[in-house]
């Protein structure tokens, strides 16, 4: 039986570039948490490409854009997804473009703050890249989870994100998830290489979160507008997401201030 916290553990899923599978990781991890029995919320904050709703097969009349514009409340926005997951759908493009402004970010976090005590996990699918809005969300989370793939561009861009978070926000530690790895040995080697290079130049701690294997069932699930954890629970990737959720389903370290009260004060 998983012991959950009295306050939500906030996990910000990020990558330095598009194409690393960040949204797939966010959705499947959140659903895996919910299937463990944890009270879980998934927040799609990728305002440029808000695709989590597609992977869940949950189109919405309302989005975060409507919440920020005052056209609806958060209760109007929340949708019940697989395993009892509560989903807050994102919006492709806000008034300020594809990223949240500091004011919009503050309004969103203020709306979410009362829910911190009602959930065990809040998974945030952040925007791709190293825009200030994405960095602030990642820096404020209990667990910054960086998605890394074997592609050289992913390696370079993940390095840039870790460096930006360390320099701009003083973020001291990260969990690194090897995604689309051909096998466990290659995934671990990818992490070891990344850690060796990062820690040579940046004073941060990197922990190996695990690996999600390259799996054709992931693509098949996307074509069905479902997440692989629900569509093909016996698939290698689905089993890996379930294992990742079990490893991460533990109480966060105690914090002096509620994390959601701090997110709005990140980089502008």
Predicted features, each with a name:
Residues 1-20, 24, 31-38, 72-76:
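Extreme N-terminal, non-catalytic leader segments
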Residues 1-10, 250-268:
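Acidic-aromatic/histidine active-site loop/patch
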Residues 16, 149-150, 174-189, 211-218:
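G-domain G4 guanine-recognition motif of GTPases
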Residues 34, 138, 166:
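Gly/Ala-rich phosphate-binding loop of Rossmann-like dinucleotide-binding domains
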Residues 42-117, 217-227:
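P-loop/Walker-type NTP enzyme "switch/lid" segment
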Residues 114-117, 131-153:
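Inter-motif core of Ras-like GTPase G domains
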Residues 155-170:
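Conserved C-terminal guanine-recognition region of P-loop GTPase G domains, centered on the G4
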Residues 201-229, 241:
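Beta-strand-loop-alpha "switch" segments that mediate conformational coupling across diverse proteins
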